[in-house]
Amino acid sequence: MTNSHISSLHSPHVERVKALLGPRGKKIRAVEKSFIADGIQSVREALHPRIELAPVVERLYLTDVGRERLIAGIDARLLDSVEISMVTDDVMNAMADTESPQGILALCTHLSLIHI
């Protein structure tokens, strides 16, 4: 688990998340085989795969409140291989696709059958 802090609205991380969620997001998600899980329930489900070809969580974007919510409900060992970026509320508001973000986003990648 590697931690970083993002406070700039012009960060490449912000731009990537916005691109995946934006109007051209469907095409970008298909090409990159990536998507954004938004909110506590979606992120928990991504971290607890129930199927063999479940998506892999590459990076978590968390506010302080989002971090507390997530850690309260999961086994911390699930985060060992995940990059974690702490973000300000302003950055989360810019990245999230909802009016009232929960402070938790995950960048996920679909596994390909070719790699198995």
Task: Please provide the spans of the model-predicted regions.
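A glycine-rich helix N-cap at a beta->alpha junction
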Residues: D80-A96
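Glycine/small-residue-rich phosphate/adenosyl-binding loop
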Residues: E99
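Glycine-rich phosphate-binding loops that contact phosphosugars or nucleotide phosphates
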Residues: A106
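Boundary-proximal intrinsically disordered activation/regulatory segments immediately upstream
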Residues: M1-D64
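Short, aromatic/basic amphipathic alpha-helical patches
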Residues: R69-S81
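Phosphate- and divalent-cation-binding pockets in alpha/beta enzyme and binding domains
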Residues: E45-A46, R69-L70, A94
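Conserved small/polar residues in nucleotide/adenosyl-binding loops
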Residues: I114-I116
